[in-house]
C-alpha cells in the first residue's frame, strides 16, 4: 500500500493499492486529489489496484463522507454487481458432447443469448418483480420525484436482462474442471435515470447554497439531513434492490437453460451450490475510525473479514472468488475487477476485431454476441492484468477459487 499526501494541496491523504504511483493515470490521480479536498471526506481516500478515471470519481475508488452523499461517487449504474453459482458438471462434458448444432457449450451460449435481452433490448412484456411491486405499494415514498415514477413501470420490462458494455454472462471452469456460472449486471436504465436526476439536483443545491466544492470537480453532493438527501437514499436503495433482483432472476434463467440443455444431451441433472450476489456501485452507512460515515464504493466491493465476494477478470481471462481480509485502511474494500487500460474508443483503435476473435479461439472461448464490431472494447487486452491486480491487493482479499472463461455472452 502506498500513501500520497501533499499537505499543501489536500485535506486528507490518499491510500493506494498499486505497485507504483506511476501505475495510475494522471487524470485518475487528479480526481482522487479532488476527493481528498472535499470538506466532508473522512480520514483518507482509498484507491483499489484496478482504479482508473471515472466520471467525477475514479472507478475503483472509495470515499467515506460525514453526513453527505455524492451521486457521482456511486455512479449511474447504481447497484451494479456480480452473481455466481457453482455446478457439479465437468467442463469437458460441455466441450466433448456434440449436438446437431455443435458442441454443447455452444448450444448453451446460443440459448442464453436468445433468451436474455442484451444491450439496449428488454422483454416484450412486463416481468415479475417483487422489488417493483413493493415500490408500487409504498409509492408515497417516491411521489416527490414524479419525473422518476415512469421508470418504476418501465423497470418491469428489464428484470432479468443483461445490458451492454462490460456486462456479461459467463460459463467458467474452476481449478477442478467443474463448470460455474458468473454474471455482471446492474440496475439497467432504472438506476441510470435515478443517478442522473439526483446529480442534477445536487448541482442545483450546491449552486443555490454557494458550495465551496468547485463545480469542475463534478462531485455535487447532498447532505443526508436534507429532504433531497433522504430522497436520494430512498431511490438509491430501490435501485440497489432492483439490481440485486435483476441478477437473481437472470441467474435463475441461465441455470434453467444450463439444466435443460445438459439434461437433454447428457441425461445428467446439474446440482448448484455456493451462490453469491454482491454490489460494487453503492453507498452505505458504516462505522470507520470511530464515526458513522457514508462509504461510497464506485467499482469496489465490500471485503470484510471472512466475507465471500466476486472479482471478475476481463473477457477470456481469469476471475476469482475471494474471501475478504477486513483491511481497515481500505474501508473493508477491494477491487471489483481488472480495471481498464484503454478507453472503449482507444481499445477499438488499438485492437482489431480479427485479433480479438483469434485470441478467443486460441483460448478455446465460445463467444455469444449479436454484433462483433465493438468486441475490442471488452477484450482482455483493454484491461489490466487481473493477476497483477490480485497480487497488489493480497492484504485485502484471499483467493478461494480461480476461474477460467469457457463461454461468454456479451451485449
Language-model regions, residue ranges each:
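Interhelical loops and loop-helix junctions of multi-pass membrane transporters/channels
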Residues: 127-131
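Acidic, glycine-rich active-site loops and adjacent beta-strand->loop/helix elements
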Residues: 51-52, 80
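Domain-length cofactor-binding catalytic modules of enzymes
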Residues: 2-31, 40-47, 53-59, 63, ...
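Short, solvent-exposed coil/turn linker segments
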Residues: 89-91, 343
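N-terminal cap/recognition module
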Residues: 68-75, 80-88
Amino acid at each position: 500500500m502506498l500513501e500520497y499526501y501533499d499537505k499543501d494541496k489536500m485535506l486528507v491523504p490518499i491510500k493506494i493499492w498499486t505497485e507504483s504511483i506511476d501505475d495510475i493515470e494522471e487524470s485518475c490521480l487528479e480526481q482522487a486529489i479532488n476527493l481528498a479536498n472535499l470538506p466532508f471526506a473522512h480520514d483518507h481516500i482509498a484507491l483499489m489496484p484496478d482504479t482508473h478515471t471515472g466520471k467525477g470519481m475514479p472507478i475503483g475508488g472509495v470515499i467515506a463522507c460525514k453526513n453527505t452523499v455524492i451521486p457521482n461517487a456511486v455512479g449511474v449504474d447504481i447497484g451494479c454487481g456480480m452473481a455466481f453459482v457453482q455446478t457439479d458438471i465437468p467442463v469437458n462434458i460441455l466441450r466433448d458432447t456434440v449436438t446437431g448444432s455443435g458442441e454443447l457449450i455452444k448450444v448453451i451460449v446460443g440459448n442464453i443469448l436468445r433468451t436474455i435481452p442484451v444491450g439496449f433490448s428488454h422483454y416484450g412484456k412486463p416481468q415479475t418483480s417483487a422489488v417493483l411491486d413493493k415500490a408500487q405499494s409504498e409509492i408515497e415514498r417516491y411521489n416527490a420525484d414524479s419525473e422518476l415514477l415512469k421508470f418504476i413501470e418501465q423497470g418491469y420490462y428489464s428484470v432479468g436482462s443483461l445490458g451492454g458494455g462490460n456486462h456479461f454472462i459467463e460459463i467458467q471452469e474452476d481449478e477442478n474442471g467443474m463448470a460455474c456460472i458468473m454474471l455482471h449486471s446492474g440496475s439497467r436504465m432504472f438506476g441510470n435515470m435515478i443517478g442522473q436526476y439526483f446529480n442534477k439536483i445536487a448541482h442545483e443545491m450546491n449552486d443555490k447554497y454557494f458550495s465551496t466544492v468547485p463545480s469542475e470537480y463534478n462531485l455535487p453532493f447532498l447532505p443526508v439531513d436534507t429532504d433531497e438527501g433522504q430522497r436520494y437514499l430512498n431511490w438509491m436503495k430501490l435501485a440497489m434492490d432492483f439490481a440485486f433482483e435483476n441478477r437473481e432472476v437472470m441467474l435463475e434463467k441461465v441455470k434453467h437453460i444450463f439444466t435443460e440443455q445438459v439434461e437433454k444431451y447428457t441425461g445428467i441433472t446439474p446440482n448448484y451450490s455456493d451462490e453469491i450476489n454482491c454490489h460494487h456501485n453503492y453507498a452505505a452507512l458504516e462505522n470507520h475510525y470511530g464515526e458513522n460515515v457514508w462509504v461510497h464504493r464506485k467499482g469496489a466491493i465490500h471485503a470484510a473479514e471472512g466475507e465471500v465476494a466476486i472479482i471478475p477478470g476481463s473477457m477470456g481471462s481469469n476471475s476469482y472468488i475471494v474471501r475478504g481480509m477486513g483491511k481497515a485502511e481500505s474501508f473493508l474494500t477491494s477491487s471489483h475487477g481488472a480495471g481498464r487500460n484503454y478507453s472503449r474508443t482507444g481499445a477499438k483503435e488499438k485492437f482489431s476485431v480479427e485479433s480479438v476473435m483469434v485470441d478467443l479461439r486460441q483460448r478455446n472461448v465460445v463467444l455469444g454476441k449479436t454484433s462483433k464490431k465493438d468486441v475490442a472494447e471488452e477484450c482482455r487486452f483493454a484491461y489490466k492484468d487481473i493477476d497483477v491486480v490480485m497480487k497488489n491487493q493480497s492484504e485485502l482479499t484471499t483467493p478461494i477459487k480461480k476461474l477460467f472463461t469457457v463461454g461468454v455472452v456479451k451485449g
